[in-house]
């Protein structure tokens, strides 16, 4: 802050008495009005004194405060978006196969793609779980299994009003065109030939789970 020259001595008003101080409203010789908005010349009982004026509202500070509030709001929105992303669970896939080796393979491929997996060894067990947990994103089932084939499981799922919207993919080690056609006609989304490869998982999940 610029202070007018000679701030000591004189008549006790804080300004040099040698022409710098005036009684009865005299003007300060070294004061250039308008160059320092923080200092103003005020007259109190005939004395001219320097007083610092503190504005109630500083426009620049108010604008800075508004900017800070907007930044805080944007940060809060970003935090909310991050929380939403963290809370969104990955798709839930059920793998059905009576072969423990094939179950392990398909489970590993799905988990490598960041999906949650429940693996069961029969169509009957799959239906039991679906009865209590119908919110499955996709079912991948082997075709040839004892007691209930993958085709039979597919039909039961598509006949259920609660489960029919779940995509079903059939897999088999046998390339039988009539079998494949029958499964697709009954509502299967795809038919994979074993051994299932990572590219197969990527193809079906990108189409059905994104």
UniProtKB/Swiss-Prot annotation:
It comes from the Eukaryota. Residues 92-205 form the Response regulatory domain. The modification 4-aspartylphosphate is found at residue 142. GO terms for biological process: cytokinin-activated signaling pathway; phosphorelay signal transduction system. Residues 61-88 have a biased composition (Acidic residues). Residues 53-92 are annotated as: Disordered. Induction: By cytokinin in roots. Signal peptide: none annotated. The keyword Transcription applies. Keywords: Cytokinin signaling pathway, Phosphoprotein, Transcription, Transcription regulation, Two-component regulatory system. Functions as a response regulator involved in His-to-Asp phosphorelay signal transduction system. Phosphorylation of the Asp residue in the receiver domain activates the ability of the protein to promote the transcription of target genes. Type-A response regulators seem to act as negative regulators of the cytokinin signaling. Belongs to the ARR family. Type-A subfamily. This is Two-component response regulator ORR7. The lineage of its organism: Eukaryota, Viridiplantae, Streptophyta, Embryophyta, Tracheophyta. The gene is RR7.
């Amino acid at each position: 802050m610029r202070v007018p020259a000679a701030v000591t001595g004189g008549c006790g008003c804080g300004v040099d008495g040698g022409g710098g101080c005036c009684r009865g409203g005299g003007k300060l010789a070294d004061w250039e009005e308008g160059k320092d908005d923080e200092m103003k010349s005020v007259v109190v009982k005939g004395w001219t004194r320097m007083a610092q004026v503190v504005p109630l509202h500083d426009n620049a500070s108010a604008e800075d405060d508004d900017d800070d509030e907007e930044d805080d709001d944007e940060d809060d929105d970003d935090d909310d978006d991050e929380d939403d992303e963290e809370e969104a669970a990955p798709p839930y896939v059920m793998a059905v196969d009576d072969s423990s080796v094939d179950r392990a393979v398909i489970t590993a491929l799905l988990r490598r793609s960041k999906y949650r997996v429940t693996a069961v060894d029969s169509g009957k067990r799959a239906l039991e779980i679906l009865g209590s947990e119908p919110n499955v994103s996709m079912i991948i089932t082997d075709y040839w299994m004892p007691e209930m084939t993958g085709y039979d499981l597919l039909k039961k799922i598509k006949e259920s009003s609660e489960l029919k919207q779940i995509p079903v993919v059939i897999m088999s080690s046998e390339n039988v065109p009539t079998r494949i056609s029958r499964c697709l006609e009954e509502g299967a989304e795809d038919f994979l030939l074993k051994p299932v490869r990572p590219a197969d998982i990527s193809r079906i999940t990108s189409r059905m789970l994104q």
